[in-house]
Regions:
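Glycine-rich, basic loop-to-helix element that forms the pyrophosphate-binding segment
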Residues: 94-110
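Short aromatic/hydrophobic "clamp" motif used to bind/position activated sugar donors
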Residues: 115
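Membrane-interface aromatic/basic loop that binds lipid-linked glycans or pyrophosphate carriers
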Residues: 141, 302-375
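Short, well-formed alpha-helical segments that are part of the catalytic scaffolds
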Residues: 14-52
């Protein structure tokens, strides 16, 4: 049976999370929330024989666990799935090279028509996965964008990150996406994107290795070359947040600013290929890259508790940015001035994210409602 979807799982010291993630790929004939919990429990206890697998779907799915030099029992956890479902689960071992390196290696091994990356500490909605495999079997677009949801472990709360398009049965280009930006932006991310394997491999693009934040690169540069894109409303990916040990925590982000800077300048190399991008590709690239640079400003100027140091870091960054890309430097100046003002006023990151950012989101929703009303 040919594979329809390949899931790449970059894995490094994820022993305590991996079982939940891998068990979420066990599509059963009766797939609901209760079944998913049962599957996770059975897998934890090694009682795979009690899981009522939908073989027709599992035969079309490939799950590649890329062992990025892990030092814990992650491989042992994954091996149990390989032993029971050798036609679906596979382990690829490599020396440690970071998240981007693990994705690059995973791409070399995919056999599916489409590929998606799911982090080892996250999981998927199993019923949505079943629907996705069935859907991908009948489309050929360069990329698919799917709604996802956040799970905040500190609050035990889910929050949707949904996309909205006029017709979920239709196919869109990047110019369309730019025109629908606020309605689809949440899905234009690492957690929302699914690539056609043939399209992705033909680009020959390699993600930055030995750094954090290359997920921004993954969702930006290859996607800027997509000629055809489809959207799925049902939420698939469950993105776990709220863990102070995660790389997305404020302290970790400040510490890893040099990584983000390296990724930004690697992304900017794609400017040399604007002529190869399809209609709307350049505009998409500018908007997405502006967002990445804006996140750099937020981390350095707002999340960094040493405000003076943050200003000095950004001044050096802006000098390099102006030299590298006058286009992107001009594109982000208004946002930079806002963040610099917030820095001077000692606006906290919690205020920015809980108050100011919410006002911006409300404005977007009002605009979205107005557009729907005018139709």
């Amino acid at each position: 049976m040919s594979k329809i979807l390949s899931i790449i799982i970059p894995t490094y010291n994820a022993e305590k999370f991996l079982n939940k993630g891998l068990s979420s790929f066990l599509v059963c004939r009766d797939t609901d929330a209760q079944t998913a919990q049962h599957n996770c429990k059975m897998a934890t206890e090694g009682r795979f024989e009690e899981i009522d697998i939908d073989k027709a779907i599992l035969d079309k799915l490939e799950v590649i666990v890329v062992n990025d030099g892990t030092s814990d029992r992650s491989v042992e956890v994954a091996q149990k799935f390989v032993d029971w479902y050798p036609d679906t689960f596979v382990i690829v071992n490599k020396t440690n090279g970071g998240h981007g390196s693990a994705i690059n290696t995973g791409v070399e091994h995919v056999r599916g028509k489409y590929l998606k990356v799911v982090d080892a500490d996250d999981w998927v909605d199993t019923l949505a996965l079943k629907h996705l495999v069935e859907y991908l079997e009948h489309v050929d677009s360069d990329a698919v964008i799917q709604s996802f949801r956040y799970y905040d472990i500190s609050k035990d709360e889910y929050r949707p990150a949904d996309v909205s398009v006029p017709d979920f049965t239709g196919e869109y280009n990047l110019k369309d996406i730019v025109n629908m930006w606020d309605d689809v932006y949440d899905g234009l991310s690492f957690h929302g994107v699914i690539y056609n394997t043939g399209f992705y491999k033909a680009l020959g693009y390699k993600l930055t290795e030995h750094v954090f934040y290359e997920d921004q690169e993954y969702a930006t540069v290859p996607f800027s070359y997509a000629k055809t894109v489809r959207f799925i409303q049902e939420e698939l990916y469950v993105y776990r947040v709220g863990d102070v040990n995660q790389s997305v925590s404020a302290a970790s982000q400040v510490k890893r600013l040099p990584d983000l800077e390296q990724v930004i300048f690697n992304v900017l190399e794609a400017e040399k290929s604007f002529a190869k991008m399809p209609q709307g590709g350049k505009e998409h690239f500018i908007r997405k890259t502006s967002g990445i640079i804006t996140s750099y400003y937020q981390i350095a100027l707002i999340k960094n508790t040493d405000r003076q140091s943050g200003r000095a870091i950004v001044e050096q960054f802006n000098m390099k940015l102006a030299q590298k890309s006058a286009l992107m430097y001009e594109a982000v100046q208004r946002k930079y001035k806002v963040f610099r003002l917030f820095n001077k006023l000692h606006v906290s990151n919690s205020f920015y994210e809980n108050q100011f950012a919410k006002l911006l989101e409300l404005a977007k929703r009002v605009g979205r409602a107005d557009r729907l009303y005018r139709k």
